[in-house]
Amino acid sequence: MTEGWISLGQLGKPFGIKGWLRFNVRDSILTKVKLPVRLKLGKSDPNFPETEIILLEIRPHNGKFVVRFEGIATPEEAEKWVGGILFLPQNLLPKIETKDEFYVRDLIGLQAIDEFGKSLNWKLTDIQDNPAHPILVFSKSEEEEILIPFLHVFVGELNLEKKTIVLIQPELWNEV
C-alpha cells in the first residue's frame, strides 16, 4: 500500500469549527516540507479506501500539531478522517543536515554491538513510541525480543554506514 511512502502519524479528533484535525505526533517533518503537499491517507479498516489528500497547513498546538486539508471545511467533514494515517512520499523528506541526525526508519536492521565492537547477534526490528522515550526492539531469535530504552545511558554510537548500533554495558541490564 505504501511502497515509497513514509508513515508520519495518525489523525485525531476534529479541532475547531473550520475542519482542522489534531495530528498525533510529537515532532513532524511536515513543518519542513513546502506546502501544499499531496499525501496519502489510509486506515487499518479494510473498508476504507486509500485516498490522496492535499495538506494546506500545519500548526503546533499544545506540544502536538493541528492540520488543515483541501476540501475539509467543517468538523463534520473532518470526523470521517479520524484515525487515518498520513503518508509522505520518501522523495519529499528533508535532507539530513548533520551526522547526528537520522530518520527512525533508517535504524531498522542495525546490528547491535557492545562498546568493544563485539557483535551481540541482535537486530533492531522496531522502535516503539513511549511517552518517556522511544523503546528499541531487538530480535535475538524468532521468539526472543529485547527492549531497550533509547537513552544515552544505554545507547552509544549509531553508524548507518556500518549498520551498527552500540549498546552500553548490555551485560548489566540484559538480565533484568
Curated annotation (Swiss-Prot):
A Pfam family that the UniProt record links to this protein: PRC_RimM
Source organism, top-level taxon: Bacteria
Family: Belongs to the RimM family.
Domain note: The PRC barrel domain binds ribosomal protein uS19.
GO MF entries: ribosome binding
Coiled coil: none
SUPFAM superfamilies: PRC-barrel domain, Translation proteins
Record domain PRC barrel: where: 99-174
Gene: rimM
Keyword Nucleotide-binding set for record: no
Protein's UniProt keywords contain Ligase: no
Chain's role: An accessory protein needed during the final step in the assembly of 30S ribosomal subunit, possibly for assembly of the head region. Essential for efficient processing of 16S rRNA. May be needed both before and after RbfA during the maturation of 16S rRNA. It has affinity for free ribosomal 30S subunits but not for 70S ribosomes.
Subunit and partners: Binds ribosomal protein uS19.
One cellular component (GO) term of this entry: ribosome
UniProt source species: Leptospira borgpetersenii serovar Hardjo-bovis (strain JB197)
Localization of this protein: Cytoplasm
Keywords linked to the UniProt accession: Chaperone, Cytoplasm, Ribosome biogenesis, rRNA processing
Biological process annotations from GO: ribosomal small subunit biogenesis; rRNA processing
Protein name: Ribosome maturation factor RimM
InterPro entries: PRC_barrel-like_sf, PRC_RimM, RimM, RimM_N, RimM_N_sf, Transl_B-barrel_sf
Main location: cytoplasm
